[in-house]
């Protein structure tokens, strides 16, 4: 809910924070109605601050803030924050997965560009991660990646060849690549899917309940395994350099 100079009771999640002064932080938050927003959280680092235990990542919040800031119209001023409740903080691999999603949103979302449907999908994914559903984490991540790319206009149609717009040939396999879109697989190429599989994903993405429909399709182990490197490469292409920190950290941990 918003007035001319204030936004009240806005559903939000903290994506990232960094120091602003000895006692204050700048928060990058994902809000339902206003997209990614930067907020100055004054005094939040003080031990007596009521905001300090509330402003955590991967927790559903209700925020109030005044529009504009001191010398920077892009930075607004936090006035109130409440934990909405509903689930605990994800742990272990689920926590790392959640921080990975946050980094994607930080890299790919412009400020003050609303994505209400994407916000709702993100909130649902965070609830799954908080539930520690180990086997569900990978297909849930692939589903979010697909919907994020489609929402931002970075995912081509998956029922036709991107270069020719020709329908996918039955029985043929295809690869999704950053600069060429969906193309016929090369000989020996492993991270690929068949035409019917790509068509099923496209149909799911266009369904009314796109998240549930897409999750049902990519929950098959073969689908999730083949999609992972293709989607990660496409996301990294649009995120630019350097490599996503969360991905690098996960790679480092796996090598220990």
From Swiss-Prot:
- Under what name is this protein listed? DNA repair protein RecO
Q: Does the keyword Lipid biosynthesis apply?
A: no
Q: Which keywords, in A-to-Z order, does the entry hold?
A: DNA damage, DNA recombination, DNA repair
Gene Ontology CC: bacterial nucleoid
Q: What family, per the record?
A: Belongs to the RecO family.
What InterPro entries does its record include? Answer: ARFGAP/RecO, DNA_rep/recomb_RecO_N, NA-bd_OB-fold, RecO, RecO_C
- Organism listed in the record: Delftia acidovorans (strain DSM 14801 / SPH-1)
Gene (UniProt): recO
Q: Which GO terms describe its biological process?
A: DNA recombination; double-strand break repair
> What is the role of this chain?
Involved in DNA repair and RecF pathway recombination.
């Amino acid at each position: 809910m918003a007035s001319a100079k204030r936004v009240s009771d806005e559903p939000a999640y903290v994506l990232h924070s960094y120091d602003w002064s000895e006692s204050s932080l700048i928060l990058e938050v994902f809000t339902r109605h206003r997209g990614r927003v930067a907020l100055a959280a004054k005094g939040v680092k003080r031990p007596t601050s009521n905001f300090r235990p509330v402003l955590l990542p991967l927790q559903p919040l209700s925020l109030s803030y005044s529009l504009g800031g001191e010398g920077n119209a892009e930075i607004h001023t936090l006035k109130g924050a409440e934990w909405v409740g509903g689930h605990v903080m994800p742990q272990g691999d689920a926590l790392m997965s959640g921080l990975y999603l946050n980094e994607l949103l930080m890299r790919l979302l412009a400020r003050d560009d609303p994505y209400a449907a994407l916000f709702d999908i993100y909130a649902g994914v965070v609830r799954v991660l908080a539930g520690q559903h180990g086997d569900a984490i990978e297909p849930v991540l692939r589903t979010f990646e697909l919907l994020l790319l489609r929402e931002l206009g970075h995912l081509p149609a998956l029922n036709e060849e991107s270069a020719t717009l020709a329908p996918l040939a039955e029985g043929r396999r295809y690869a999704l690549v950053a600069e060429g879109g969906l193309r016929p697989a090369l000989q020996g190429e492993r991270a690929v899917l068949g035409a019917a599989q790509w068509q099923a994903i496209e149909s799911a993405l266009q369904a009314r309940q796109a998240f549930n429909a897409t999750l049902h399709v990519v929950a098959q182990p073969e689908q999730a395994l083949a999609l992972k490197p293709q989607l990660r490469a496409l996301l990294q292409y649009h995120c630019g350099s350097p490599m996503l920190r969360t991905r690098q950290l996960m790679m480092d941990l796996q090598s220990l």
